Design a protein with these regions (language model features):
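Auxiliary Fe-S-binding modules of radical SAM enzymes
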Residues: 1-89, 241-250, 255-346
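Generic beta-strand structural signal
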Residues: 77, 89, 100-104, 112, ...
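Canonical Radical SAM [4Fe-4S] cluster-binding loop centered on the CxxxCxxC motif
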Residues: 95-132
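Conserved AdoMet/S-adenosylmethionine-binding subsite of the radical SAM
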Residues: 141-150, 155-317
Length: 346
């Protein structure tokens, strides 16, 4: 079945030719889907009835909103969406002075197995289509009636494990004629799929790459992230150096701080030594509590000291502002609770 919301304008032109319509209709349909964010052909006012009847064979991806939790602390909104096949995914709206930012999922579940992450507990169900990634943004923008200016692909899933769909998503998200979010306002995270980082570098996109590092050495990283058994930190950093050389875009390293595991002065100094010479920034994140995990988040003092020790060694760092701490803000938690509730009611 053709997924019309995942098609580029050129592909829509080909489809129009195939069904006996003029190519200019493609731009009209594309605008309705990706600029006006409609969810049915009936809303496409400038299309003839005959074309709408033909398009009935090409259903439009439209996520169903199951739940919205709104933080009383900072207005952060967490959305739970249901896909057409019944799978569920999460997205988060974060409000900043510079605009509205949405964190989206790239997969239903995740197979990377990071020890501190709720979204990987049930494993990977499937990859999301480009349209399903886009529609998280579209449904949220429609629900709040305000423009989304920034997107982070940092929700459930490993984006580079869904590489082809990710690239198509980026193309549609950032090109003219649609919602048109600048590449510079897009961040894509990865736990460190080294070959895919090299591939992505060749695209020369002007987005930010955020690499989940979480440890200063391979031994500690293997304790936290199974991917570290496949790719060493040296291999990962070599890919990051290449990425910067190709794109001239500063790398962000995500570092979740776990009490007594990776938050000491020595850990900070070792991390700084590893990152020296790379144009990068470290985002420090007190680990989110997850019921099924025994990890304890570092104290505020430990986090601040870690930042100070990094900066003494010449590495810039920031402490991530916690958003939605009162609404199950950690990745994957709302979805997991909803699935547990649904299962218990059977």
């Amino acid at each position: 079945m053709t997924d019309i919301k995942s098609m580029t304008i050129d592909e829509l032109k080909e489809l129009m030719t195939q069904i006996g319509e003029k190519p200019f209709r493609a731009k009209q349909i594309y605008s309705w889907l990706h600029e006006h964010l409609v969810t049915s052909y009936d809303e496409m006012a400038n299309l003839p009835k005959s074309l709408k009847q033909k398009l009935a064979d090409y259903p439009i991806t439209a996520l169903e909103t199951l739940d919205v939790q709104i933080s009383k602390v900072d207005g952060t909104r967490k959305y739970l969406f249901r896909l057409a096949d019944g799978n569920m995914i999460e997205s988060v709206l974060m409000r900043y002075k510079y605009g509205n930012s949405v964190c989206i999922s790239s997969q239903a579940g995740c197979r990377m197995g990071c020890r501190f992450c709720a979204s990987t507990i049930g494993g990977l169900t499937r990859n999301l289509l480009p349209s399903e990634m886009l529609d998280q943004i579209y449904r949220i923008q429609t629900s709040i009636g305000e423009r989304i200016s920034n997107v982070v692909v940092m929700g459930t899933g490993e984006p580079l494990d869904n590489y082809d769909n990710l690239l198509r998503f980026i193309h549609i998200l950032t090109e003219d004629g649609g919602i048109h979010i600048s590449q510079r306002n897009l961040t894509v995270s990865t736990c460190g799929l080294v070959p895919k980082i090299y591939e992505l570098a060749e695209e020369k996109l002007q987005m930010t790459l955020a690499v989940s590092l979480h440890a200063p050495n391979d031994e500690k990283r293997r304790e936290l992230m199974p991917i570290a058994n496949k790719y060493s930190i040296d291999e990962l950093l070599a890919a990051c150096h290449n990425y910067f050389d190709k794109t001239v875009r500063r790398i962000t390293f995500e570092y979740s701080l776990v009490a007594g595991v990776n938050d000491s002065k020595e850990n900070a100094q070792e991390l700084a030594g590893r990152l020296k010479g790379l144009n990068c920034h470290v985002n420090l994140i007190p680990v989110n509590p997850v019921r099924e995990r025994s990890f304890v988040r570092s104290t505020r003092e430990a986090v601040e000291n870690f930042k100070i020790n990094l900066e003494k060694c010449g590495i810039n760092g920031t402490i991530r502002r916690e958003m939605g701490s009162d609404i199950d803000g950690a990745c994957g938690q709302l979805r997991k609770r909803y699935m547990e509730k649904t299962e218990s009611e059977k």
